[in-house]
């Protein structure tokens, strides 16, 4: 097997003592990895896409935790405030996933049954956005890794499939979960169908109303779907009593899904972002992208990714961050979040609950407060009060940058992208597209041939109501006041850790 390691590739062999990494000569790089390619640098001027064969798909996930200069803070038990152990997570997750959550191994083998399902759509293509570059009249080179070719139309099956696999292996009858825009819910419904598990989904009410066909997609794959807040849980009923038209939030939907899972021995909960094992599953995106950028003969100067809970961003960026830490490339890596839900750029780095009802372990992360309810922006998958603890920790180490962008600028960029590249993006990655366009315009001003990499983590075929709102002129940007943040932060526990 061959993997990118900075400027070259390494062959990996196994022995009794573990993994051996042997640098390959340039000619061997070509033969081992790219078949009939005759060079490792340069590309035909007309080349738009870079494709890997199925046998070149990575067979391991990458765990960045052991490579960091400092370990991330532990999750805390909500009752004792002591570091949470495996038994504290057992009511929610199977032990295999708990062990991945706390793993100190840099690489985890992908099970064969998971690889077989991955091959339905993986490896995914890397595109050079030549027509967008031309429209922008920029010397920049823009590359995007497209995850919209999966059955659910996004990157989410990269983790829903292994989560369903490990739960099925543990004898779980049903998985519960939350979803915002419906990308995660539909991905888990697809995965559960592959392994014969029931699936019950609480979808944020604002998105449930705005994106009805995602509900239908989930039901096609056998899932049961409820708007959140719902009258099925005590927490949901309390919120509806206060506001019958409550728009919901991902934090609320998580609380309802956890409330259904925790009391039952044969029911577990699946999370679509935030946690370490979820981000680790997504690193197959970045591992493939490293190989494909090598095919293109380019190394990114700037990597941008949309961030809500952090799974898409971590999946693309962590393998590149590994190479940066090893001194093999010098890439600026930037999180891009919605201006209406800016947990990194305006939130505090504090211990907080992952859900709104305070049922989960406390995690140290950038948060706007677990009771924060974002305005109903169209990027429903980014409406989460916190940021992945791992992404937050790496940001605190000074290894990442962050910016926030309003949704009208994002959709302006999405329209330009769709009219040049042909793909209608989901609302979530429009944030990364807008950031890439900003970088391309900077390159135009400076005359520098900046290489930009991003992930188009899903298509927007079921998000056309959002595009209709933009094209009709009814879409607005929301101003998040300091008072709104302060009010939500008032309920965050005060923990000296």
What is each residue range found by the language model?
Residues 107-109, 239-277, 297, 322-330, ...:
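Active-site/ligand-binding loops adjacent to catalytic centers
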Residues 146-159, 175-184, 275-278, 304-309, ...:
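Active-site nucleophile and cofactor-binding loops and adjacent substrate-binding regions
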Residues 157-162, 177-195, 209-212, 307-317, ...:
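Short glycine/serine/threonine-rich phosphate/pyrophosphate-binding segments
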Residues 184-247, 343-353, 464-472:
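Active-site-proximal loop->helix
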């Amino acid at each position: 097997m061959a993997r990118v390691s900075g400027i070259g590739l390494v062959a990996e062999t196994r022995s009794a003592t573990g993994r051996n990494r042997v640098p390959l000569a340039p000619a061997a790089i070509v033969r081992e990895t790219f078949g009939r390619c005759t060079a490792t640098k340069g590309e035909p001027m007309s080349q738009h896409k870079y494709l890997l064969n199925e046998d070149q798909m990575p067979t391991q996930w990458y765990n960045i935790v052991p490579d960091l200069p400092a370990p991330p803070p532990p999750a805390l038990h909500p009752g004792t405030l002591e570091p949470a152990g495996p038994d504290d997570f057992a009511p929610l997750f199977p032990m295999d996933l708990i062990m991945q959550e706390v793993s100190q191994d840099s690489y985890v083998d992908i099970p064969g049954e998971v690889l077989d399902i991955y091959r339905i759509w993986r490896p995914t293509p890397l595109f050079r956005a030549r027509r967008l570059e031309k429209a922008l009249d920029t010397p920049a080179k823009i590359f995007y890794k497209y995850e919209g070719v999966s059955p659910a139309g996004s990157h989410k099956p990269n983790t829903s499939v292994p989560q369903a696999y490990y739960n099925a292996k543990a004898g779980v009858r049903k998985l519960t979960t939350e979803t915002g825009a419906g990308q995660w819910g539909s991905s888990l419904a697809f995965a559960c169908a592959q392994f014969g598990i029931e699936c019950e989904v609480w979808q944020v009410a604002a998105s449930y109303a705005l994106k009805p066909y995602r509900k239908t997609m989930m039901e096609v794959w056998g899932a049961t779907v409820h708007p959140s807040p719902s009258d099925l849980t005590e927490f949901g009923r309390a919120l509806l009593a206060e506001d019958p038209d409550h728009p919901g939030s991902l934090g609320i939907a998580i609380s309802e899904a956890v409330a259904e899972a925790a009391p039952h021995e044969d029911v577990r909960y699946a999370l679509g972002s935030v946690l370490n094992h979820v981000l680790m599953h997504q690193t197959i995106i970045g591992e493939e992208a490293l190989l494909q950028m090598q095919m293109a003969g380019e190394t990114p100067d700037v990597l941008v990714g949309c961030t809500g809970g952090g799974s898409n961003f971590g999946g693309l960026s962590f393998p590149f961050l590994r190479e940066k830490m090893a001194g093999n490339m010098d890439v600026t890596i930037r999180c891009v979040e919605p201006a209406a839900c800016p947990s990194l750029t305006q939130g505090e780095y504090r211990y907080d609950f992952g859900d709104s009802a305070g049922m989960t372990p406390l995690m140290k992360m950038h948060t706007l407060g677990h009771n924060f309810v974002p305005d109903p922006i169209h990027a429903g998958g980014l409406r989460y009060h916190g940021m992945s603890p791992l992404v937050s920790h790496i940001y605190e180490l000074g290894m990442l940058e962050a910016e926030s962008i309003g949704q009208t600028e994002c959709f302006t960029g999405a329209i330009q992208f769709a009219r040049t590249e042909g793909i209608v993006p989901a609302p979530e990655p429009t944030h990364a597209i807008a950031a890439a366009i900003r970088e391309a315009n900077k390159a135009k001003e400076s005359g520098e041939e900046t290489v930009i990499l991003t992930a188009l983590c899903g298509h927007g075929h079921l998000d056309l109501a959002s595009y209709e709102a933009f094209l009709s002129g009814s879409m607005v940007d929301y101003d998040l006041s300091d008072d709104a943040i302060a009010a939500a932060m008032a309920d965050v526990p005060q923990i000296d850790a």
